[in-house]
Amino acid sequence: LMLDTGFDKHLDAMRMLMANMMHETCNFVYMKEISNGLAYNNRPDLGNGPDDGPKYKGAGVLQLTGKFNYQQLADEINDQKVMQGVDYVSTTYPFTSARVWIEKNNLLGVCLNQGFDACCTTINGGWNGIEDRRIKYALCQREMK
């Protein structure tokens, strides 16, 4: 993932991405979002209709979320089975889903030009879990040399 997206050439950006992946997956334990996904129903910003939330809840190391993002992944990798939802993506494409999202959203550019907080809000869409993300970022700064 780091090689495929260019993060391998930028140590601090790599730390930012690693910290966020650690947060999103509870240290790489969960490749599917723990919540039931109902909060994502009727979210046009995600491309979700009335019942799409649970099907298109977070999957993979960056917790790809929303019908729109799932369709982008399906189109990019030419696999329409992605539209089966979270179970398929979380087991089949946990890292590929992140790669495609990173590229589509220029996350490396965000990290390099705007820093850690912007990286977090780009990934999460808000400040959810920011304290844990900061703790993990500090850990990555200490351990990733």
Model-derived regions, located:
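Second-shell loop/turn segments in exported
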Residues: 3-7, 51, 81-89, 120-127
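Extended serine/threonine-enriched, polar tracts that run as long, contiguous segments within proteins
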Residues: 99-108, 123
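A generic secondary-structure signal for well-formed alpha-helical elements
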Residues: 24-28, 68, 105-106, 127, ...
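Extracellular low-complexity, O-glycosylation-prone Ser/Thr/Pro/Gly-rich "stalks"
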Residues: 121, 125-145
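Peptidoglycan-targeting cell-wall enzymes and recognition modules
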Residues: 13-102
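Surface-exposed patches in mature extracellular/periplasmic domains of secreted proteins
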Residues: 5-17, 30-33, 108-120
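Acidic helix/loop microenvironments that form the catalytic cleft of cell-wall polysaccharide enzymes
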Residues: 21-24, 111-130
